[in-house]
Amino acid sequence: MSQQFNVAIFGATGAVGETMLEVLQEREFPVDELFLLASERSEGKTYRFNGKTVRVQNVEEFDWSQVHIALFSAGGELSAHWAPIRAEAGVVVIDNTSHFRYDYDIPLVIPEVNPEAIAEFRNRNIIANPNCSTIQMLVALKPIYDAVGIERINVTTYQSVSGAGKAGIDELAGQTAKLLNGYPAETNTFSQQIAFNCIPQIDQFMDNGYTKEEMKMVWETQKIFNDPSIMVNPTCVRVPVFYGHAEAVHVETRAPIDAEQVMDMLDQTDGIELFRGADFPTQVRDAGGKDHVLVGRVRNDISHHSGVNLWVVADN
């Protein structure tokens, strides 16, 4: 009989936590016992998992000694408090927040890109999960990086409101309904109205004029590729789409490569679905519920001898 694990999801009632629950079930992960954890406010809420009803427990009162693996998605402050305590007690923590991503002794892992880094979890019993926009970009760029190297990445993201959690989803839905019925939109989650609008700000602005979301893509790319020489120039935009992120990616490679070669490599890469010719993926039509990274509009840069353009879409 294969090994089974007792798994805890901390932040189980959030948008990401609920998706974690769905993925564990869909992938038939070998779960022996499942524990759903959240704040006292969500205690008692129930979910179905593998034909059973599982009740959400208060994290403050939970006995962690029975847990082997914990998936954290309850926010950076809570991860900062709980993850080291639980990891030191022997729980393997996989953290979905940004809190541990830049610690030198904690692996930042995309299984399709740097699976060898997983072994470093033994340093502190914590594995960090990269930002969603970084993940889809690097899955698409990994074959190019391995083949000819990458000098520079210019990327503009078009990120759905679900990246801001349930609050973002509710705000887009609420604003859209009000505006279509002739009422003014109320703005709480985003810096400006998101319905029928695009906002070139995700997270706070930093001293260099970039947002923190944009700098995450810089730092994470360099760490995951273990290559601090890669230059990354991102602009991150929140768009009025409920689910799925899209990215217009331009790379300057260290040696020239033809777009046909790039497409052939992508077509043979696990985890990528390639769209050729005039067909291209979109968040609404193609990305929902898919694990693959979708790539289209692959073409050589007409202004640079070592440039390649890609359109990259994924369910965040």
From Swiss-Prot:
Pathway: Amino-acid biosynthesis; L-lysine biosynthesis via DAP pathway; (S)-tetrahydrodipicolinate from L-aspartate: step 2/4; Amino-acid biosynthesis; L-methionine biosynthesis via de novo pathway; L-homoserine from L-aspartate: step 2/3; Amino-acid biosynthesis; L-threonine biosynthesis; L-threonine from L-aspartate: step 2/5. It catalyses: L-aspartate 4-semialdehyde + phosphate + NADP(+) = 4-phospho-L-aspartate + NADPH + H(+). PANTHER family: ASPARTATE-SEMIALDEHYDE DEHYDROGENASE, DEHYDROGENASE, PUTATIVE-RELATED. It comes from Vibrio mimicus. NADP(+) binds at residues 13-16, 41-42, 162-163, 316. The active site is at residues 132, 245. GO terms for biological process: diaminopimelate biosynthetic process; isoleucine biosynthetic process; lysine biosynthetic process via diaminopimelate; methionine biosynthetic process; threonine biosynthetic process. It is an enzyme of class 1 (oxidoreductase). Gene3D superfamilies: Dihydrodipicolinate Reductase, domain 2 (3.30.360.10), NAD(P)-binding Rossmann-like Domain (3.40.50.720). Keywords: Amino-acid biosynthesis, Diaminopimelate biosynthesis, Lysine biosynthesis, Methionine biosynthesis, NADP, Oxidoreductase, Threonine biosynthesis. Belongs to the aspartate-semialdehyde dehydrogenase family. InterPro entries: Asp-semialdehyde_DH_CS (IPR000319), Asp_semialdehyde_DH_beta (IPR005986), NAD(P)-bd_dom_sf (IPR036291), Semialdehyde_DH_NAD-bd (IPR000534), Semialdhyde_DH_dimer_dom (IPR012280). Catalyzes the NADPH-dependent formation of L-aspartate-semialdehyde (L-ASA) by the reductive dephosphorylation of L-aspartyl-4-phosphate. Its EC number is 1.2.1.11. This is Aspartate-semialdehyde dehydrogenase. Phosphate binds at residues 101, 216. PROSITE patterns: ASD (PS01103). Pfam families: Semialdhyde_dh, Semialdhyde_dhC. One of its GO terms (molecular function) is aspartate-semialdehyde dehydrogenase activity. Substrate binds at residues 159, 238. Homodimer. It comes from the Bacteria.
